[in-house]
């Protein structure tokens, strides 16, 4: 299955199908789910479902792409980027951690890792729609802030990656190994404050 070679037709019930599929993948995971379950959850016929998506893999990829696009837009597009870097980066970190610790974010990450050998396209879709887009958006902000004299950065891609890794400190390893999946606001605040202060200690002016 190659998503790039699969024509996805949109129609009147397209969003309805995606919503049903999202619920099924969250509840059942990838391996246990099937197109019958998706059709039932979406309230559409199997014929309608297959008119949009030829297989479960293509459907999963579009569900991931749609949700990740929404999350990545919220991560930077809804933030006042004219504010001080500490404020902008703090808000960006909060959005990143919000997605990382969400039920959807955790479940999709685990599915993509579990299916990586059989369906590498799933992991690629998750990466390209989520982490890569956020990296590009943060990198664009860092470039603009540097041009405005608010930051001092020469390698914007590296700096964006470093900021992302700082936001994952302590939280991501716990999620990865299933040690902890629910986090208190104070735990997230600690990571956010540490990420921003460490980043600005390196790149602030």
Predicted regions and their residues:
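Amphipathic alpha-helical packing segments from all-alpha helical-bundle domains
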Residues: 87, 98, 107, 111-113, ...
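Amphipathic alpha-helical linker/stalk segments
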Residues: 63-92, 98-100, 104, 108, ...
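C-terminal peripheral helix-coil segments that are non-catalytic and often amphipathic
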Residues: 1-4, 91, 95, 136, ...
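Hydrophobic/aromatic residues within well-ordered alpha-helical segments
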Residues: 13, 56, 67-68, 89-92, ...
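Basic, helix-initiating cap at the start of DNA-binding domains
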Residues: 1-44, 51-58
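Helical hydrophobic small-molecule/effector-binding pocket
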Residues: 86-118, 122, 167-171, 201
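Membrane-interface starts of transmembrane alpha-helices
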Residues: 152, 156-160
